């Protein structure tokens, strides 16, 4: 099991800047005291501080070539600006992501650093921060009541990363603690993005018939299929959109999809 992405290191760096810019636009224009429906313990301001703190934490890991986890309390500026206003929060987000991207670009994708996975390199962090920002931008868009969409290559890679992380042994073990008989004969899930542009392979089969979850990119019949626009399918898997939304279609054993989503929730 690898955590190989489909974009180049520079494409991840550019996407991280672009996704943060889109988040910042929401921060500048929305009610920062609004509760985030998909993260109900947070206001929009707290969500933005979480994302900006994650950027700076990652930037510190990369810039210092950390060989072990970094205490968030040791990250310069990691707690966010003292000023609670939108302008200060926007400027803090911009400064943090620029510092992090500069560190990622300087390091390149293959520099060894600590991570919580088997992929102990800077390339892992470039990809992870893009998709951390994508999903929390979805949260912010929900809180602000504004549309949410993701460029197709980024959305497909975000979905692929979700499946890859869900197959890591330490993650599978954590999921298994939630109980339930998820694995077994005939338990397969087909995910199909119906609006993928030509050349983008945006169909996956999640195979739950073996000793651990596995996936492959293929068009293949399954016990249940989730179909819809790529951004919407991604949100369903990350539980930012309910599977019974009229924006997606579920065909077959709906209970299996629901069980998987409950079992494999993270992020």
Model-identified regions with their sequence ranges:
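Acidic/histidine-rich alpha-helical segments that form the ligand environment
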Residues: 81-111, 122-132, 139, 182-190, ...
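A glycine-rich beta-turn/hairpin centered on an aromatic-Pro dipeptide
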Residues: 162-206
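Glycine/alanine-rich phosphate-binding loops at beta-alpha junctions
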Residues: 1-6
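Short, mixed-charge aromatic SLiMs
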Residues: 72-84, 154-168, 253-265
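Active-site-proximal cofactor/substrate-binding loop regions of enzyme domains
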Residues: 11-81, 85-91, 95-96, 100
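C-terminal interaction segments
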Residues: 219-267
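Short, contiguous alpha-helical
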Residues: 31-72, 117-176, 233
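Acidic/His-leaning functional-site neighborhoods
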Residues: 194-230
């Amino acid at each position: 099991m690898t955590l190989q992405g489909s974009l180049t290191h520079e494409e991840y760096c550019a996407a991280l800047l672009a996704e943060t810019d889109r988040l910042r636009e929401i921060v500048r224009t929305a009610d920062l005291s609004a509760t985030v429906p998909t993260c109900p313990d947070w206001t929009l301001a707290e969500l933005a501080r979480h994302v900006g703190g994650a950027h700076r934490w990652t930037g510190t890991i990369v810039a210092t070539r950390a060989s072990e986890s970094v205490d968030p309390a040791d990250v310069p500026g990691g707690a966010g600006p003292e000023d609670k206003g939108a302008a200060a929060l926007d400027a803090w987000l911009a400064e943090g992501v620029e510092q992090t991207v500069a560190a990622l670009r300087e390091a390149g994708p293959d520099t060894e650093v600590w991570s919580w996975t088997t992929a102990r390199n800077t390339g892992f962090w470039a990809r992870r921060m893009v998709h951390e920002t994508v999903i929390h931008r979805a949260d912010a868009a929900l809180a602000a009541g504004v549309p949410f969409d993701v460029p197709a290559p980024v959305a497909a890679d975000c979905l692929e990363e979700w499946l890859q992380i869900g197959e890591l042994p330490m993650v599978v073990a954590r999921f298994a603690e939630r109980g339930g008989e998820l694995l077994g004969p005939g338990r397969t899930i087909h995910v199909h993005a119906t609006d993928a542009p030509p050349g983008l392979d945006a169909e996956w089969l999640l195979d739950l018939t073996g000793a651990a979850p596995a996936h492959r990119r293929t068009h293949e019949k399954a016990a249940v299929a989730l179909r819809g626009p790529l951004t919407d399918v991604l949100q369903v898997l990350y539980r930012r959109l309910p599977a019974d939304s009229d924006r997606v279609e579920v065909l077959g054993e709906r209970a299996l999809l629901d069980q998987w989503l409950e079992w494999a929730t993270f992020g």
